[in-house]
Amino acid sequence: MALIDAIHAREILDSRGNPTVEVEVLLSDGQIGRAAVPSGASTGEHEAVELRDGDKGRYLGKGVQKAVDAVIDQIAPALTGFDATDQRSIDQAMIDLDGTPNKSKLGANAILGVSLAVANAAAASADLPLYKYLGGPNAHVLPVPLMNILNGGSHADSDVDIQEFMIAPIGAETFSEGLRWGVEVYHNLKSVLQAKGLSTGLGDEGGFAPNLPSNRAALDLIQEAIKNAGYIPGKDIALALDVASSEFFKDGAYQFEGKALSATEMSAYYAELVADYPLVSIEDPLDENDWEGWKTLTDAIGDKVQLVGDDLFVTNPSILQRGIDTATANSLLVKVNQIGSLTETLDAVSLAQRAGYTTITSHRSGETEDTTIADIAVATNAGQIKTGAPARSERVAKYNQLLRIEEELDDAARYAGRSAFPRFKG
């Protein structure tokens, strides 16, 4: 039994040049676990609180020294001597120490950093890769990558309202093959954009961010790139969207493509897209508080496409339960920093899967080289992962980790492929 001997934290930088928390946990057997905490650009209002310093004279107010101090001065003394394998008790001790419903005292970034670092240390102590430590012998499914290759919304400086246009290599036989297909489409998209005189500048998550006349224009460009790469849209590679609609929901209407639309009108728009394009997934199609609209949309097209609750559910089991009870949405986006601890994240995944909801392990737009979410995706047999374009090292780090896991699993590895999207009829 390895006990927690010491916990240290520091400020490091994320992929957007903003400070974030990194934590190291030292165990009595000499093993060390490390984890860095991601940060989002478009965040749900019900997410656990990311503690920032607010000192405008330092990192423009975005420093995280308060969270670092919380780890060193409060969390570390409270957890010293805990059995590192008792993850649930460790996480609960931090939640109790914080004492708020949204982790606003210590900060979700402080609690999560410790939670993930403990898991990494315990896995090292057990001489197991993290995915096997968390998932046991059943951890063998490699996720379909939802690769964000064209950016709009708050991830880019353009007139495109939808935040992420993604490709999903559903027809591949293995993860490595699916990743290769995605890379080839990504590079073909760059060539398509260049040929049309469009910008090939990159957004936060490595996708291209051209200024386009409409959201459909973005889908058309991606389909052209898929064909140019030698693949068939809908058969080999499908499309997916993250609308992030809460970002353009103002004064009771959706400010979309120059018009103020109702939830009913937005639902009709999505139904047309699903009919016209090989779409397997639409994330946050409506505002996080528009539960009535979400229910109407789910009833209308939920049998044809994956409807993903990100801002809607914020990886919170109690909010997800409301969705399950009302048959609202049919998929959960899993972001560890939305809820702020590993065990609460695993609880949300388990609840979703038991209810027949699909699950997607996800990065944030502000990322680091930490690869923990790749292991979580395999540990939970999530079937899908969102971790950006096949560009920028903080995104590629997760893909490379999944390649290593697939190689290690060898014949036991299974790629989720088309089975990850049971509602897709394409």
Curated annotation (Swiss-Prot):
Pathway: Carbohydrate degradation; glycolysis; pyruvate from D-glyceraldehyde 3-phosphate: step 4/5. The gene is eno. CDD domains: enolase (cd03313). The active site is at residues 205, 335. It holds the Pfam family Enolase_N. SMART domains: Enolase_C (SM01192), Enolase_N (SM01193). Keywords: Cytoplasm, Glycolysis, Lyase, Magnesium, Metal-binding, Secreted. Its EC number is 4.2.1.11. It is found in: Cytoplasm; Secreted; Cell surface. One of its GO terms (biological process) is glycolytic process. Signal peptide: none annotated. This is Enolase. It comes from Arthrobacter sp. (strain FB24). SUPFAM superfamilies: Enolase C-terminal domain-like, Enolase N-terminal domain-like. (2R)-2-phosphoglycerate binds at residues 163, 335, 364-365, 386. It comes from the Bacteria. Catalyzes the reversible conversion of 2-phosphoglycerate (2-PG) into phosphoenolpyruvate (PEP). It is essential for the degradation of carbohydrates via glycolysis. Its main location: cytoplasm.
